[in-house]
Amino acid sequence: MDKIIKSIAQSGSFRAYVLDSTETVALAQEKHNTLSSSTVALGRTLIANQILAANQKGDSRITVKVIGDSSFGHIISVADTKGHVKGYIQNTGVDIKKTATGEVLVGPFMGNGHFVTIIDYGTGNPYTSTTPLITGEIGEDFAYYLTESEQTPSAIGLNVLLDENDKVKVAGGFMVQVLPGASEEEVARYEKRLQEMPAISHLLASKNHVDALLEAIYGDEPYKRLSEEPLSFQCDCSRERFEAALMTLPKADLQAMIDEDKGAEIVCQFCGTKYQFNESDLEAIINDKA
């Protein structure tokens, strides 16, 4: 089961979140049938949103949009504070690797664009923030958002490793944030440790990558685990929700579906589930509108 572990240094000078998001990203790949680069880009966005959602309280709903002008198009993710996340990528078929190493490429195919977050607190006044894409690698773009928009300097690591068949092998990440009151000496020490950390891809390849991440972040610094919470890819779409959407259409459009297509098929963008509405279903909706 996927999870996020929240921890804090014994000194109270900084905190860290580490995540195992393997099942989340694997299910997203299965739902959308994504190829290598698209899988990694979508996976990193889902992990970023899992971190962002874990930072919220109450019943907030968090939307992350990575909007580029190159091959991937838009990547959209929605998460809640209960550990659920869903998402999709416009172009599922990007599959580009370095010839020499086989490394999956992401940044060069994101292009210029923006990292957009929408936090809906359920009050009717969602908070929206937009920051530019810095590298298109998503992790750096997320860190820039946290620094610029939330005024919280953060170190972020996100990645998805694929097997020889380009299926998700492991996915996860971390966030480290300095807390108010940390001394300059403590900040310098943590910055040095982060600079010396192995690459996130190397840590994820460890047998127990969650423990490997924590060990790399804290070293011999005492820390305590605050909580361990489950994470999952879960879509909240339903037939009732799409039926309500059909109710908003003009009668003429619904009648055209009956006359021309003998019904309607609606596919959820986030999970690919198909919902069929036959002629009788559409006629009932038309009658309900009357």
UniProtKB/Swiss-Prot annotation:
MF annotations from Gene Ontology: protein folding chaperone; unfolded protein binding
Statement: the UniProt record of this protein carries the keyword Endoplasmic reticulum: no
InterPro entries in alphabetical order: Heat_shock_Hsp33, Heat_shock_Hsp33_C, Heat_shock_Hsp33_N
Protein's cellular compartments: Cytoplasm
PTMs per UniProt: Under oxidizing conditions two disulfide bonds are formed involving the reactive cysteines. Under reducing conditions zinc is bound to the reactive cysteines and the protein is inactive.
Disulfide bond recorded as keyword: yes
Lineage: superkingdom: Bacteria
One GO cellular component term: cytoplasm
A Pfam family matched in the record: HSP33
Keywords, ordered alphabetically: Chaperone, Cytoplasm, Disulfide bond, Redox-active center, Zinc
One Gene Ontology biological process: protein refolding
Disulfide bonds, paired cysteine numbers: 235-237, 268-271
Family: Belongs to the HSP33 family.
HAMAP family the UniProt entry points to: HslO
Task of the protein: Redox regulated molecular chaperone. Protects both thermally unfolding and oxidatively damaged proteins from irreversible aggregation. Plays an important role in the bacterial defense system toward oxidative stress.
Name of this protein: 33 kDa chaperonin
